[in-house]
């Protein structure tokens, strides 16, 4: 082989017949898919002194930039035989768009976002967001207080609030407020709480809902993709029942590479056809309630009798790290949350474990120290006190703050339900057993107010 041929092969690696066959099997038999193509759109140029005028400009820009998102994604899916499950949009945090209007009524912008999402045919639109890790402006406070009504009167708008970071500490005033807000959101309709995430260390390029927003350091518009393939990873591990931990890690890495390569390919093709930049691939393993599409099942295939048993956190740490190591080699740029999601209601084996009492909130919290995000799609009794929800948020945020990772809470207090009951959300949102929650009282702690300072290791300069 001459030098030119060698360099050409380095630039464009040849996919062997066996690898092609494996990828086809992943799609047809193991639930491999592109979980989302998400277009990020900056709305900073839509700001005016009048919220209704701003809302009109928001609608116009989203419609202009994302006009071909759904047709292009559908065409790529048909052309290459790769399922693309969701087409989504993330936008600039809405709290940044309204500070010049004294009314601070965000409903016109939320309605404009919802109308654009429906008119374009996208599944969800994220970015009804406030970033309050250092403190809250009047606009940000108004946005947080508007969440119960906005999430009840829109269908496709998703919201998030970042209440802390490793560099800033935790805004406990915002934590207290969000405990009340989450409860009010769920009291109107439990499903509304599925569209709200409370973060610590939120990332600016997350393509997954409900926590996606388009950060202010991002460009005007770009494409992000989120891949998924728990079934692919599980089958690869199942084929090696006697493998050592090193061999399991290597197997996961090789599988994650193939999965992420597909995400890179689809994202690049979509960006090229839409004539916008390609940004990142999110390497997350995102489960669904479908059989064989479970992150918990991967952990059980490693040798656990059920998720939640001692060893679960170690198995999840191994999985999360190996997915990152394998996927990062496959993509030009990796970002988002990138890891393994453990949403209770969206994972068939997690649903089973929760229903049988085999996994507790405390064990889930331990798992969040090593997984992609945090307490996700957790249903709790409807009479759970606001302060208890604030305490859950504070605990998760503290894990993220100290460990310099993204953590989050998407908890759903279900009116009229108690431990042992279940609630049906339907579709990819699945079934949620109502989980027991510690009945202690955190009210005095939450009422102290102020901020929990940033950890000592946050001072890097």
Swiss-Prot record:
Pfam families cross-referenced by the UniProt entry: DUF711
Coiled coil: none
Chain ranges passing through the membrane: none
Family: Belongs to the UPF0210 family.
Self-association and partners: Homodimer.
Full protein name: UPF0210 protein LCABL_10110
Protein source organism: Lacticaseibacillus casei (strain BL23) (Lactobacillus casei)
């Amino acid at each position: 082989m001459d030098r030119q041929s060698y360099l050409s092969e380095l630039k464009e690696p040849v996919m062997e017949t066996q690898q092609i066959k494996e990828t086809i099997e992943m799609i047809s038999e193991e639930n491999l898919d592109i979980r989302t193509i998400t277009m990020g759109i900056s709305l900073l140029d839509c700001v005016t002194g009048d919220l209704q005028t701003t809302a009109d400009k928001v609608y116009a820009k989203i419609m202009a930039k994302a006009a071909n998102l759904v047709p292009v994604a559908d065409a790529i899916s048909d052309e290459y035989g790769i399922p693309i499950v969701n087409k989504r949009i993330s936008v600039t945090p809405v709290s940044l768009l309204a500070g010049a209007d004294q009314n601070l009524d965000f409903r016109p912008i939320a309605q404009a976002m919802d109308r654009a999402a429906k008119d374009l045919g996208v599944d969800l639109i994220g970015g009804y967001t406030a970033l309050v890790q250092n403190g809250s402006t009047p606009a940000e406070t108004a946005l947080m207080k508007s969440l119960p009504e906005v999430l009840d009167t829109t269908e496709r708008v998703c919201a998030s609030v970042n209440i802390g970071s490793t560099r800033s500490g935790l805004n406990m005033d915002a934590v207290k407020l969000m405990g009340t807000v989450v409860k009010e959101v769920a009291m109107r309709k439990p499903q509304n709480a599925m569209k709200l995430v409370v973060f610590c260390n939120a990332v600016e390029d997350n393509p997954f809902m409900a926590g996606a927003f388009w950060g202010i350091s991002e460009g005007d518009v770009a494409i992000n993709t989120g891949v998924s393939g728990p079934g692919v990873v599980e089958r690869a591990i199942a084929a090696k029942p006697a493998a050592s931990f090193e061999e399991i890690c290597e197997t996961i890495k090789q599988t994650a590479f193939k999965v992420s390569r597909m995400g890179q390919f689809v994202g690049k093709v979509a960006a090229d056809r839409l004539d916008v930049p390609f940004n990142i691939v999110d390497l997350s393993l995102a489960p669904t309630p479908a059989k064989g599409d479970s992150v918990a099942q991967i952990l059980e295939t490693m040798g656990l009798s059920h998720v939640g048993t001692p060893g679960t956190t170690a198995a999840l740490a191994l999985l999360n790290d190996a997915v990152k190591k394998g996927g990062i080699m496959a993509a030009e740029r990796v970002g988002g949350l990138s890891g393994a999601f453990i949403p209770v209601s969206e994972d068939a084996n997690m649903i089973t474990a929760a229903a049988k009492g085999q996994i507790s909130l405390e064990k889930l919290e331990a798992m969040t120290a090593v997984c992609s995000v945090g307490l996700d799609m957790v249903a709790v009794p409807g009479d759970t006190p606001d302060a208890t929800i604030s305490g859950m948020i504070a605990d998760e945020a503290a894990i993220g703050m100290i460990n310099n990772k993204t953590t989050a809470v998407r908890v759903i207090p279900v009116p009229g339900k108690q431990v042992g009951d279940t609630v049906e959300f339907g579709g990819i949102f699945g079934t949620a057993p109502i989980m027991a929650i510690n009945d202690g009282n955190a009210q005095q702690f939450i009422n102290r107010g102020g901020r929990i300072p940033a950890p000592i290791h946050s001072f890097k300069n």
